[in-house]
Design a protein with these regions (language model features):
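Residues in flexible loops and secondary-structure boundaries
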Residues: 5, 23-32, 39, 44, ...
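Long, Lys/Arg- and hydrophobic-enriched amphipathic alpha-helices
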Residues: 55-229
């Protein structure tokens, strides 16, 4: 990012989920952190005390308590990133699209094993050391954290919605009128429609991906993508 952004829109799509995370486990009123160690047979998990007090503060500021044995991820890099964005942006918007939830849902009992997954050639696994350096490691985004840390640097929450509702609201205002083109074949137009469908259906990306919009230096705008359906 430049040192100063006088006016603009900072847009990201699947940026935050690719940032490194801390893996922690609830231990009564305390936390334990999972480190990467080196054992007799290669890389392995090592459970020790948290590496930073910021991990405890992260949950405290969101009023989140992990159950005994509950695993979770903490993306401190995302906290630093949104704080930096807020400090450098003087007027404009921050649009963050990614898969994840707000804290209340992200850290509920449906996610007792956390959300960290490894991807390689369309294969999903929780064996993070199987092909070290060759797998993509991703964890769900905590949008509550982005909201709270953004506020600390002047970003105001404009709105939060699912990708499905966001795109359908935009479509209602004619923003995808050129989705079909007379210059394309019927097969190409069909492919476009199918690709758009994957972005809005619950079975595709529609409800998995969320959209967080924040603004700074301007009145709260009435954005088409945030209008109720």
């Amino acid at each position: 990012l430049p040192d100063r952004i006088t006016c603009g829109c900072i847009f990201s799509n699947e940026l935050i989920d690719a940032m490194p995370v801390h893996r922690v486990t609830g231990d009564g009123n305390h936390l334990r952190e999972t480190y990467v160690g080196l054992g007799m047979h290669g890389l392995c998990d090592e459970i020790r005390s948290p590496s930073s007090a910021a991990l405890r503060e992260y949950f405290a500021e969101q009023n989140v308590h992990l159950e005994e044995g509950q695993q979770a991820e903490v993306n401190l890099s995302a906290c630093r990133w949104i704080e930096e964005v807020g400090k450098k942006l003087e007027r404009g918007f921050v649009v963050t699209i990614d898969y994840g939830h707000e804290a209340e849902e992200l850290y509920d009992q449906r996610h007792m094993r956390g959300t960290l997954l490894a991807y390689q050639r369309h294969r999903v696994t929780e064996d993070f050391f199987r092909a070290a350096g060759e797998q993509d490691l991703t964890a769900h985004v905590n949008f509550t954290s982005l909201d709270l840390r953004g506020r600390q640097s002047g970003l105001i929450r404009t709105g939060f919605t699912s990708q499905s509702k966001f795109l359908l609201a935009l479509a209602r205002h004619g923003n995808f009128a050129d989705l079909q083109s007379d210059e394309l074949s019927e097969a190409e137009n069909m492919q476009r429609r199918l690709l758009f469908k994957t972005l809005i259906t619950p079975e595709g990306m529609g409800e998995t991906f969320q959209v967080l919009i924040q603004h700074k230096g301007t009145r709260r705008p009435d954005l088409a993508g945030l209008q109720p359906l």
